[in-house]
């Protein structure tokens, strides 16, 4: 199940500034861009992102209540900066229950088997981790925070 939440009321300038300070590396799913996936501290654990982490936690909790899922915890989080021309390869998130994507900036749709989501700044997308998803070629820079969850 895929749910979209509009968090565009958040001021993301501080979040974006902090993300751009964090050291990144290449990522096998990101052909043109950078990531913190498996590189350094989980991005949602940075003290500067505590407010955002707490807001996302509340939406994960609402999702769990709606779909009768036991309480969850974050098990990892990272961000990707994808440049124009990047394609996110089809994949799913193993060993996770619910995954999420929070868009700082976005361009190309996030595509699932039966639907797609058009991203915008401040969009939070929560989905079952076993759903395969990908993007077509990005038309502009995309900055996204992604995360996985597991049972408490």
Regions found by a protein language model. Give the residues of each.
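Catalytic core of non-heme Fe(II) oxygenases with the double-stranded beta-helix
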Residues: 71-137, 141-152
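Non-heme Fe(II)/2-oxoglutarate
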Residues: 1-69
């Amino acid at each position: 199940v895929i749910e979209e939440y509009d968090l565009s009321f958040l001021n993301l300038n501080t979040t974006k500034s902090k993300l751009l300070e964090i050291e990144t590396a290449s990522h096998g799913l990101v052909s043109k861009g950078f990531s913190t996936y498996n590189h350094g501290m989980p991005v949602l654990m940075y003290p500067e992102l505590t407010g955002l982490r707490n807001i996302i936690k509340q939406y994960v909790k609402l999702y769990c209540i709606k779909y009768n899922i036991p309480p969850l915890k974050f098990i990892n989080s990272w961000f990707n900066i994808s440049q124009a021309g990047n394609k996110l390869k089809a994949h799913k998130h193993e060993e996770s229950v619910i995954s999420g994507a929070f868009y700082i900036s976005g361009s190309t749709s996030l595509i699932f088997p039966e639907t797609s989501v058009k991203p915008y700044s401040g969009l939070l997308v929560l989905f079952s981790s076993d759903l395969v998803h990908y993007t077509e070629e990005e038309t502009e820079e995309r900055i996204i925070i992604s995360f996985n969850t597991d049972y408490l």
